[in-house]
A protein has these predicted regions:
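Glycine/small-residue-rich loop that forms an oxyanion/phosphate-binding "nest" at active or ligand-binding sites
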Residues: 55-102
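N-terminal glycine-rich anion-binding loop in soluble enzyme alpha/beta folds
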Residues: 1-56, 124-128, 132-159
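Conserved beta-alpha
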Residues: 89-152, 232-233
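Hydrophobic alpha-helical
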Residues: 164-196, 206, 211-212
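Short, flexible loop segments at boundaries between secondary-structure elements
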Residues: 149-152, 200, 204-224
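Short, well-structured alpha-helical segments in soluble
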Residues: 48-61, 165-177
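Periplasmic-binding protein-like
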Residues: 64-69, 117-118, 177-184
Length: 233
């Protein structure tokens, strides 16, 4: 049995439902919650103070890989902050580790997505910061549209169709982009990835897809996984 450690701003067992649909059998995810109340900088700063302790506690268990999710937490200090976080993790543990933003950048590059549209459930200011972060890694967010929510509980209740409709609107106005990026693992959009790619003819990168693939690669277990978009095929 392989084990992935997962640190997330708003971890819950419910969040793993889509993860286990994607992961091959024989892999367990052990999660820890940073407990971000709202997606604002003061909250990100607060949980940053306890982040190292969470890493230490989680990595006392036998882990094959450690993944840190939460695009907004990872990007709130600006471009390159994912690398800073990974550097701090490497001082605590020898467990191979990555972040969801590192994984998203790798996923976009793998699909030749240099010019993208971003559909998100987040507030406008957080989308703009995330766009600047991606630009630092040479991924241009040509246009973005957001739903404006700063609370994971509200986002969790959103229908997958909210993602589909947002992407449809963005691509109708920006048909020349290379693909679509959709952040947030609390936005339950995994079930509509294939339909969006089929209907709109563009590859789609989401939070969950990207970090799962990154973790599988890190454990030497990458394999084609049908049903969840081109990235995993």
């Amino acid at each position: 049995m392989k084990q992935i450690g997962l640190i997330s701003p708003n971890f819950s067992e419910d969040t793993l439902v889509d993860v286990y649909k994607i992961l091959p059998e024989g892999i367990h995810v052990e999660g820890r919650n940073l407990d971000v109340a709202r997606y604002i900088d003061s909250e990100f700063h607060r949980v940053e103070q306890t982040f190292a302790d969470v890493v230490r506690e989680l990595t006392r268990q036998p882990l094959d890989f450690l993944m840190i999710t939460g695009e907004l937490f990872l990007s709130y200090k600006g471009p390159g902050s994912d690398r800073q976080i990974l550097a701090s993790v490497s001082e605590i543990t020898s467990v191979p580790a990555s972040t969801v933003l590192t994984a998203v950048v790798q996923a976009c590059r793998a699909l030749n997505m240099r010019r993208v549209v971003m559909a998100s459930p987040f507030p406008e200011d957080q989308d703009l910061r995330l766009s600047r972060f991606l630009a630092h890694d040479e991924i241009e967010v040509v246009a973005h549209r957001c739903l404006g929510y700063n609370n994971s509980k509200v986002i969790w209740e959103l229908s997958p169709e909210t993602g589909y409709e947002l992407v449809s609107s963005l691509l109708s106005e920006n048909p020349g982009v290379d693909g679509v990026y959709m952040p947030c693992n609390k936005w339950r959009i995994t079930s509509v990835i294939e339909r969006m790619e089929k209907d709109f003819g563009k590859p789609v990168v989401t939070n969950t897809q990207a970090w799962v693939l990154e973790a599988l690669r890190g454990m030497g277990m990458a394999q084609p996984i049908p049903g969840f978009g081109r990235l995993l095929q």
